[in-house]
A protein has these predicted regions:
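Accessory nucleic-acid engagement/destabilization modules that flank
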Residues: 1-174
Length: 174
């Protein structure tokens, strides 16, 4: 981090050097998690018959073309990270990685929560296939935690708003 960020920026993020490095690594690994959804993979796999056949052993990859625009991958990344209980600040950095922060309502509308279904769940998994997609997310998320030096989601830092903005800028420029 010393090479990429001036001391003044690192101070405003308010994480010690090691935790900042771990956090930046984690964000680099999870910011595109929204691409692990039927909404994103379906159209790509339509052009790749061999990988599609392998994936179709686990999922139908069905999606609704007219609904894809409601779950762009940056928004989907934030929604999935929140679904996985990632701290909201870190999830919002992933959601803003193309320079546009997401609104809380838009994020909530994606997958909802334990008490309420989201409006766009069909963009994330075909009917009856939620467990498959959740297991994919969990595996990628756990890998990112491990590779970044965190042993659990509980070790991830809570960020201040200035830290979120600065880390989003770092992620955008990376």
């Amino acid at each position: 981090m010393q090479r990429w960020l001036p001391e003044s920026v690192r101070q405003h993020i308010e994480l010690d050097e090691d935790l900042l490095t771990q956090t930046a690594c984690f964000l680099g690994l999870v910011h595109d998690l929204g691409k692990a959804s039927t909404n994103f993979q379906g159209p790509i796999m339509a052009q790749l018959p061999e990988p599609r056949q392998c994936l179709e052993k686990y999922t139908t990859l069905s999606y609704r073309e007219q609904n894809r625009k409601y779950s762009r991958h940056a928004l989907a990344s934030e929604a999935i990270l929140r679904w996985l209980k990632c701290p909201n600040g870190l999830a919002s950095v992933a959601g803003a990685h193309h320079g546009k922060p997401q609104t809380g309502k838009d994020v909530f509308d994606q997958l909802g929560d334990e008490e309420e279904e989201g409006s766009w769940e069909s963009n994330y998994w075909p009917e009856g296939e939620q467990k498959f997609w959740e297991s994919c997310w969990r595996e990628l998320f756990d890998y990112a935690l491990q590779e970044s030096g965190f042993s659990s989601v509980d070790e991830l830092p809570q960020l201040t708003i200035p830290a979120e903005i600065l880390l989003a800028g770092l992620l955008i420029m990376a």
